[in-house]
Design a protein with these regions (language model features):
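Right-handed parallel beta-helix
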Residues: 1-14, 21-35, 46-58, 89-97
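Glycine-rich, acidic and aromatic/proline-enriched surface loops and short helix-turn segments
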Residues: 7-8, 234-241
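Short glycine/acidic-rich loop motifs that flank beta-strands on beta-rich extracellular proteins
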Residues: 11-19, 34-40, 58-66, 99-104, ...
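A conserved active-site cap/scaffold subdomain adjacent to cofactor or substrate pockets
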Residues: 42, 47-61, 66, 74, ...
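C-terminal functional modules
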Residues: 90-91, 95-226, 232, 239, ...
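Acidic, divalent-cation-chelating loop motifs in proteins
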Residues: 221-229, 248-256
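Extracellular-facing binding/remodeling surfaces
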Residues: 239-250
């Protein structure tokens, strides 16, 4: 299950559908792809691609069908099924800048590699009118998902990481962000044949972190953790654990099924037992918080 992720500014690292089974892609954002949005699969693939956002960026070839591609189903993994595709439920996805495909995802957004005269017949065999069974998830409409993902994705706790801030800003503005001296930091091994121009950083595709200003330097004051179990002394003392006993990190103080260190990491009060098997209790436990304790 791929849910509420951001896939941004790459040429070959977006989702590739595996063979023989389900593939669920819900409420994600794919931005600034070059030759791949989603592709792959085989005759046994069962795809749910629901309420996502596909936003072309500076590197996306707007003069090609790739620019409004949601998914490219593939076949031919086995000789006896070389022309047999899997099944797909594709619905509710927004392709930014393309009203036609947004209105009907099957009007150009699903692109099996067949000739035009076989396209209608092939799509009819692939298309499903109802989604396949998949893990429980609250599905947002695509517009709401776009805003939700951009405000929640990445390293946001206790504040947004500088790298993720740059990526999110690029998605919002639709523009590549790079350093003034980016041209000085080209790095591609001589053994690698380039597929893009040397200045592809101007379109969001970098080959060296220094092309976008380098990696940020993080500073902070470590909290006291006497037993080194990953849980601060103050948190352990607050909830009746032993700051001198590292073994209590993997214990379960309230029997809810999560280790104590998992409770700490997820901001859960270990004195309150919650039935996490009840789906209505499942939520983002860090939502709205600025610190763990």
């Amino acid at each position: 299950m791929f849910c509420r992720n951001l896939f941004a500014s790459n040429i070959s690292r977006n989702c590739s559908i595996g063979m023989d089974g389900d593939f669920n892609f819900v409420n994600n954002i794919t931005y600034n792809w070059w030759n791949r949005s989603i592709d792959g699969g085989d005759n046994k693939s069962l795809l749910n691609i629901i309420n996502n956002n596909f936003k072309p960026g500076p590197i996306t070839p707007l003069d090609k069908p790739t620019s409004y591609r949601i998914v490219k189903p593939e076949a031919g993994r086995a000789k006896e099924f070389k022309d047999v595709y899997g099944k797909a439920y594709v619905n509710g996805n927004i392709v930014h800048g393309n009203k036609r495909v947004t209105a009907d995802n099957w009007d150009g957004g699903v692109q099996p590699p067949v000739s035009e005269d076989k396209m209608e017949e092939t799509l009819a065999k692939i298309k499903m009118d109802k989604p396949f069974d998949m893990p429980h998830v609250t599905i947002m409409d695509a517009k709401k998902a776009y805003n939700y993902v951009l405000s929640h994705v990445g390293a946001t706790f206790p504040k947004r990481d500088a790298v993720d801030h740059r990526m999110v800003k690029s998605v919002k503005t639709g523009k590549a962000i790079y350093a003034k001296d980016a041209a000085n930091y080209e790095f591609v091994p001589t053994t690698v044949k380039r597929r893009l121009p040397v200045d592809s950083y101007k379109k969001g595709i970098i080959t060296d972190p220094r092309q976008v200003g380098g990696l940020p330097e993080y500073k902070g004051t470590p909290v006291l953790d006497t037993d080194g179990d990953g849980m601060p002394d103050a948190w352990e003392e607050k909830y009746g654990l032993n700051p001198n006993d590292a073994s209590d990190a993997i214990q379960d103080i309230n029997g809810d099924g999560y280790n104590n260190i998992e409770k700490y990491i997820n901001g859960i009060d270990p004195t309150k037992k919650i039935d996490w098997t009840d789906l209505k209790n499942n939520h983002d436990t860090l939502e709205g918080k600025k610190k763990l304790f």
